[in-house]
Design a protein with these regions (language model features):
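Short, flexible/disordered secondary-structure transition segments
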Residues: 53-58, 76, 80-84, 96, ...
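Positions within ordered alpha-helical repeat solenoids
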Residues: 45, 49, 71, 75, ...
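Cullin-RING E3 adaptor/co-adaptor recruitment helices
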Residues: 2-258
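Internal alpha-helical scaffold/solenoid segments in large eukaryotic proteins
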Residues: 288-290, 307, 316, 340, ...
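A structural signal for leucine-rich repeat
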Residues: 164-167, 236-240, 264-272, 291-301, ...
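Conserved hydrophobic beta-strand positions in leucine-rich repeat
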Residues: 94, 149, 247-254, 277-281, ...
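Short, solvent-exposed loop/turn at the beta-strand->alpha-helix junction
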Residues: 49-50, 63, 75-78, 131, ...
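C-terminal capping region of solenoid repeat domains
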Residues: 1-22, 26-29, 409, 413-414, ...
């Protein structure tokens, strides 16, 4: 059970709410490029190798060099040195994304699930260490000056969210206790002196406090899926809105999964809309009626730039009307995921009233009809689209409109995914010319479409000739599969297919760097002619 939950969290840190810096290089593990380090960075790297050495150094170095030490400790995962640095942090604030290398970069996470898992683990390591160490420093009354911890841009594990929320409530309850104790002591001081009588004088009381008497703020990206964390977070967000709260939690992104409409209503009402920029409500089993109830609450979050409503049940006219009304209230929204909501024939109704232009649009398994693709090809969003995913829709009947759509976004589109779109040879021959004219395309996914080897070669020639292409995901050609041949011959055919693809790629690219090819099985064998 624990393993599946962990896997679920890793799978969730991607998509609309977690944008990739596609133009930056991979920044983790074997993919990370080595850069020439400055003398300051080399010295900092040496110091943080030993926590005791770090503890000695922070007593003498100028405060601005603490930043270099923290950067080195984060980069090399020196947890004990990080603890020392936070306990002696000389500044009022610490912003993680200014210190740690950005991990959500390049197109690699789009096709390499192992790499995605690695960068999420590394991100969770950063936020876990900082959160725990920060609270421990407060409880131990260390000489840190840190009052504002910003961990946005890096995922926070649900267990850490629960840990922070419980401490937020602990600080609130202790503050209330302190107020009551002070009131009691004032009353005791006003009582007449009992020394001349036989009665004993009331004793003054003291209040124990875990956190210093000041105001501290933790800003983060939260993931919540359990009832226990949901309940604790709702209470913590409620008290965080009080002006005199000692420990406040602020959310910039929220991923709320498997909670349902009623719990979402309660949670969303506690969040300050001033700060929330990304919201993911995937797998909440929202029916049409549920979404109509939830939509007015969502309209509060007018600063959202990313919204993920995938894997719910938004399909009928009323819910699509509510969705369209909601989107018209989100002027800054540029990233949207409606996957696995059957909005067939209603895409114009949903997207046409938006005041903003979408840069990211994911419509996987939405049952798109020809009219939907036709709308997309002429909509105001086409001028700004950078990432588009139309996978698991039958695009074969919409070949002409698909060609028009690709032509309209040829100068802006960076990633294009059309996996399992039932595309056949004739359609791909038609759109290959459009693919060859894509000016900024970096990643394309055409896997699980039933294409012959000759058409694969034709499309390959168009795609790998693009100057910006970095990765291309495709299935083996349908020629590789037949019920009449033994397994070893299928393997030979697949090897031949791979060889032909690389031959075409080398003929087109010459001595230039070759893009990465990802071959996968053609799963939909029932579509093979």
């Amino acid at each position: 059970m624990q393993t599946s939950q962990t896997s679920l969290q890793y799978d969730h840190y991607q998509g609309a709410v977690y944008p990739l810096d596609l133009h930056a290089d991979p920044n983790h593990g074997q993919f990370r490029k080595t850069h020439i380090k400055s003398l300051v960075n080399l010295c900092a790297e040496y110091i943080v190798r030993d926590a005791s050495f770090t503890r000695e150094a922070v007593q003498h170095i100028p405060y601005h060099l603490s930043v270099a030490l923290m950067q080195a400790a984060l980069l090399d995962n020196r947890d004990r040195s990080m603890e020392t640095l936070i306990s002696h942090w000389p500044l009022n604030s610490l912003t993680l994304k200014k210190l740690a290398p950005s991990l959500f970069t390049s197109v690699v996470p789009l096709y390499n699930s192992t790499y995605l898992t690695d960068i999420v683990r590394q991100s969770l390591r950063y936020t876990t260490c900082l959160s725990h160490t920060f609270l421990e420093c407060l409880k131990k009354r260390t000489p840190t000056k840190l009052k504002y911890l910003d961990m946005t841009g890096f995922p926070t594990a649900e267990v850490i969210l629960f840990y922070l929320a419980t401490h937020c409530m602990l600080a609130h309850n202790e503050a209330r206790q302190t107020v009551m104790v002070n009131m009691y002591n004032r009353v005791v001081n006003l009582l007449p002196d009992q020394t001349q009588s036989n009665e004993s004088s009331p004793q003054l009381m003291t209040a124990d406090t875990t956190i210093p008497d000041s105001s501290f703020t933790v800003k983060m990206d939260a993931f919540v899926t359990s009832d226990q964390t949901h309940a604790e977070l709702c209470k913590a967000l409620k008290v965080s809105g009080f002006q005199d709260s000692k420990l406040k939690i602020v959310l910039e992104k929220l991923d709320a999964t498997c909670l349902g409409e009623q719990k979402l209503q309660i949670l969303l009402q506690q969040i300050n809309p001033k700060f929330l920029q990304g919201l993911r409500l995937k797998y909440n089993a929202l029916s049409c009626e549920d979404f109509c109830k939830l939509s007015p609450v969502l309209e509060r979050f007018d600063r959202l730039t990313a919204l993920d409503l995938s894997c719910n049940n938004i399909r009928h006219k009323d819910s699509c009307d509510s969705l369209a009304h909601l989107l018209s209230f989100l002027p800054h929204l540029i990233r949207l995921d409606l996957s696995n909501n059957r909005v067939k024939t209603r895409l114009r109704q949903v997207l046409s009233n938006m005041t903003s232009t979408l840069q990211y649009l994911r419509l996987v398994a939405c049952g798109l009809a020809l009219t939907d693709v036709a709308y997309l090809s002429v909509s105001h969003h086409i001028s700004g689209l950078q990432e588009l995913d139309l996978s698991e829709n039958n695009l074969q009947p919409a070949a002409a409109n698909l060609s028009k759509l690709l032509k309209g976004c040829k100068s802006t589109l960076h990633t294009l995914e059309m996996e399992d779109c039932k595309l056949r040879d004739d359609t791909m021959e038609m759109v290959a010319g459009n693919l060859a004219s894509m000016e900024t395309l970096m990643y394309m996914n055409l896997s699980d479409n039933s294409l012959s080897l000759s058409v694969h070669e034709f499309v390959m020639e168009a795609v790998v000739g693009l100057p910006s292409i970095q990765a291309y995901r495709l299935s083996f050609s349908k020629d590789c599969y037949s019920a009449d041949i033994p397994d070893y011959q299928q393997v030979m055919r697949k090897d031949f297919c791979v060889g032909q693809m690389y031959r075409v790629m080398r003929n087109v690219r010459g001595e230039a760097t070759l893009p990465h090819l990802i071959f996968v099985e053609l799963e939909r064998l029932d579509y093979v002619e």
